[in-house]
Amino acid sequence: MAELKTVGRFAPTPSGRMHLGNVFAALIAWLSVRSKGGEMVLRMEDLDTQRTSEEYAQILREDLRWLGLDYDRETPPQSARSAVYDRYFDKLAEMGLLYPCYCTRSQLHSVNAPHLSDGTYVYPGTCRNLTEAQRATFHRAPAWRVRVPDRVWTVEDWVQGHYECNLATDCGDMVVRRADGVYVYQLAVTVDDGEAGVTEVVRGMDLLSSAPRQMYLQELLDFPHPAYAHVPMLLAPDGRRLSKRDKDLDLGQLRARVTPESLIGTLAFSAGLIERNEPVPARELAGEFRWDKLRRESIFLNSEQLI
């Protein structure tokens, strides 16, 4: 049997300039794929069309080229794939797994709603078994949820190790389409990765809890499970997660004062991939990349380290 080709992906949201956390995840994803002679796919995750734009998408492409992180093909953006998601939504509906949910945001986040220790809410199934007569009393468009089983899902993550989640108790039935008709991240990403033939998903540790949710949808929609690697978060010195609000650490600012080689070198050194903080092009790291070198804990960075 022929060995399965490695396919990875960049999946940025074109809502602003890339920040260092985006660059770090993209770098590790790229190194993993290129170290195996695999294929990189670019996909713009622009479900929220109010916050995203083609202008930022083009800037993201230019930033990736500047960094030396090439890709082999670009798939259509999520905003152009509603008809595709419709087909998979219909498949879930035909399986009898979808139901309309009329809960408001305030109801879901009320102090009386079930919450996990990190503050996220667990959907209690309020609308799961409503009768048609009860549904008729609501005079607003519903969101749509997929029923989840009382079952433990396990992820053997390349970075975080063993992780498990019972969707029924740790998540509850998941929204797959919002009341305004927009498909949500979990369904769109599952379909996009599945149709693109993605074999490994590399992204930030903050998305680890998404893996079991997507594995469940993959099983329902007949997609194979990819391998998962959730890389450490990049944090500011005060412990905040770097975001697009940290303007001094986004590529719009950094490109004016550092070279791509120095930026790649600092990230690789901070992650434990090289022994000295020195400029290095991404292509020189690919041949030596190994997952067991990568740090597991969060990485603290400030702008002075990049001068």
Identify the meaning behind each predicted range.
Residues 57, 82, 105-108, 120, ...:
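Alpha-helix initiation and N-capping motif
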Residues 106-243, 250-254, 303-307:
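Active-site cores that bind ATP or allylic diphosphates and position pyrophosphate for catalysis
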Residues 1-15, 35, 40, 135-137, ...:
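Non-catalytic terminal extensions that flank enzyme cores
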Residues 70, 98-99, 117, 260, ...:
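A general structural signal for well-ordered secondary-structure junctions
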Residues 93-105, 151-155, 159-164, 278-297:
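A short, terminal or domain-edge coil/loop segment
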Residues 72-74, 225-228, 274-280:
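Short, surface-exposed acidic
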